[in-house]
Amino acid sequence: MVHSQLPVAASLRLLCALLLLPSATMIPGGLSPRSVTDPDVREAAEFAVQEYNALSANAYYYKQLRIVEAQSQVVAGAKYYLTMELMKTKCAKTTGKPKVYKEIQNCELPPKAQQEKLTCRFQVWSRPWLKKTELTKMSCN
């Protein structure tokens, strides 16, 4: 009795093709790397910096130096996982009129010997159809 090898060969080719697919396409809701220059990532980063400054007890604003890494996850909306570097500025916080992101980014930095840099990890949850964005997690050191 002769058995055809065609179904086995076709199955092996299919298996190899599936293994070559990026892992994010195989796991619904999984994390996917994102470019730090992606407009959605930049918007989430701006929101994170604004919220960090609103929530922190620091007397001075911190501005974004750079986005180190970005990932996203499709949930009910999009969740952005950001690693960012922030730097303390010379702009003091004043009660009643908080600065917006663009104003903070224009703040001067202190002299090099007095500079304080933070590495922060933020999770930003965006649901545009509800016009709602939330900072769901924040840690800086």
UniProtKB/Swiss-Prot annotation:
GO terms for cellular component: extracellular exosome. A motif (Secondary area of contact) lies at residues 73-77. Residues 1-26 form the signal peptide. One of its GO terms (molecular function) is cysteine-type endopeptidase inhibitor activity. Disulfide bonds join C91-C107, C120-C140. InterPro entries: Cystatin_dom (IPR000010), Cystatin_sf (IPR046350), Prot_inh_cystat_CS (IPR018073). Keywords: Disulfide bond, Protease inhibitor, Secreted, Signal, Thiol protease inhibitor. Transmembrane segments: none annotated. The record marks G29 as: Reactive site. It comes from the Eukaryota. Expressed by the venom gland at an extremely low level (at protein level). CDD domains: CY. It is found in: Secreted. Residues 29-129 form the Cystatin domain. Belongs to the cystatin family. Inhibits various C1 cysteine proteases including cathepsin L, papain and cathepsin B. This protein has no toxic activity and its function in the venom is unknown. It may play a role as a housekeeping or regulatory protein. Negative results: the recombinant protein does not inhibit calpain-1 (CAPN1), a C2 family cysteine protease and legumain (LGMN), a C13 family cysteine protease. Does not provoke cell death (PC3 prostate cancer cells). PANTHER family: CYSTATIN-M. This is Cystatin.
